[in-house]
Regions:
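N-terminal glycine-rich, Lys/His-bearing helix-loop that initiates the first secondary-structure elements
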Residues: 1-57
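Short, hydrophobic/aliphatic alpha-helical segments
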Residues: 5-11, 74-79, 202-204, 208
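Short clusters of hydrophobic/aromatic residues that line enzyme substrate/ligand-binding pockets
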Residues: 12, 62, 214
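Conserved PLP-enzyme active-site core in the AAT-like
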Residues: 17-20, 85-283, 290
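Short, basic and Ser/Thr-rich N-terminal targeting/leader segments
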Residues: 24-25, 71, 82, 219
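Structural beta-strand/beta-sheet cores of well-ordered domains, especially the beta-sheet scaffolds
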Residues: 27, 33, 221-222, 287
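Conserved N-terminal alpha-helix of the aminotransferase class I/II PLP-enzyme fold
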Residues: 34, 39-97, 124-131
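Short, glycine- and charge-enriched coil/turn segments that flank and shape catalytic ligand pockets
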Residues: 51-56, 231, 282-285
Length: 291
């Protein structure tokens, strides 16, 4: 079986093990806001564990802490990314914000984190980094000059590749090599996991606006961050619980529903885009084509 076949199969089955255990074919939508429990001590333990970033507990207690529909969608993305954990949010920008907030909580001194970022980057991400809405110290660097921008307080390197909407590309592995022990987050929204998996190139975090390819049908907003670092996963869930920026179960259901067709959709989109780019490049009225 080829790698392409593997991805097609993974996309169909990802996040569905618990569905099969329920004796169902399609994932159900769990819209409960609270969950009953018989043991107050177990509920208290679960609340504490989930509030501090655990992925599961004896009981969900409250939908802001855990929701089975959201968890299945997260598992599906994690399997496609080759990650151990995915944390879902209400939007791509909620995911970006959570990464920046988690960066601070993971520092022992809780000092203002220094972030090295590469432009071009998604416009609202750029705004978030420069607007002082978050207590983050940002240095902008060229992709080949990241090492020169690093400081002892540098807590994160942030890139987007391909960039939205310019399609500028950044060599992920080259950035990771320059970053050393500093975590690298890659906004890979324009290159879904069937095209690019940043963790395979050494990135600590892979981020997507699920509103684009992952949702794929123009009817869902969401954001996801995938990682195989347990501390990061816990910190990201902690931020989500504390800020309430959770993905609604119905949106999670729609995103998960879209996973089986992701490889086919991306393949067809790439084929159409290639044909269109070829035609535009040959047109005398077109000065430049970014593809």
């Amino acid at each position: 079986m080829s790698a392409s076949d593997d991805l097609y199969t993974t996309a169909v089955h990802a996040g569905r093990a618990s569905v099969h255990a329920l004796g169902k074919h399609a994932p159900p939508i769990d819209l409960s806001s609270t969950y009953p429990f018989d043991d107050m001590d177990a509920a208290a333990r679960s609340l504490t564990e989930l509030a501090h970033g655990a992925s599961t507990a004896e009981t969900p207690v409250y939908a802001r802490l855990h929701n089975p529909t959201v968890a299945r969608a997260e598992q599906a993305v994690a399997e496609l990314e080759g990650a151990t954990d995915t944390v879902a949010y209400a939007s791509g920008m909620a995911a970006v914000t959570a990464v920046l907030m988690a960066t601070r909580t993971l520092r022992d001194d809780r000092a203002t984190p220094h972030v090295v970022a590469v432009r071009p980057i998604y416009g609202t991400t750029d705004h978030l980094l420069t607007s002082n809405l978050l207590d983050v110290d940002v240095s902008w660097a060229a992709p080949d000059a990241i090492a020169e921008s690093m400081r002892p307080a540098t807590a994160l390197v942030m890139i987007e590749t391909p960039a939205n909407p310019t399609l500028d590309l950044v060599d992920i592995q080259a950035v990771v090599d320059q970053a050393g022990d500093v975590p690298v987050v890659v906004d890979s929204t324009f290159a879904p996991p069937v095209i690019q998996r940043p963790l395979e190139h050494g990135a600590t975090l892979s981020l997507h606006s699920a509103t684009k390819f992952l949702g794929g049908h123009g009817d869902v907003m969401g954001g996801v961050v995938s990682t195989s670092d347990a501390d990061w996963a816990a910190a990201l869930r902690h931020v989500r619980v504390a800020t309430g920026a959770l993905l609604h179960p119905h949106a999670a259901y729609l995103m998960h529903r879209s996973m089986p067709t992701l490889p086919a959709r991306v393949e067809r989109a790439q084929s159409t885009a290639t044909a269109l780019a070829d035609r535009l490049q040959a047109h005398p009225a077109v000065q430049a084509v970014h593809f």
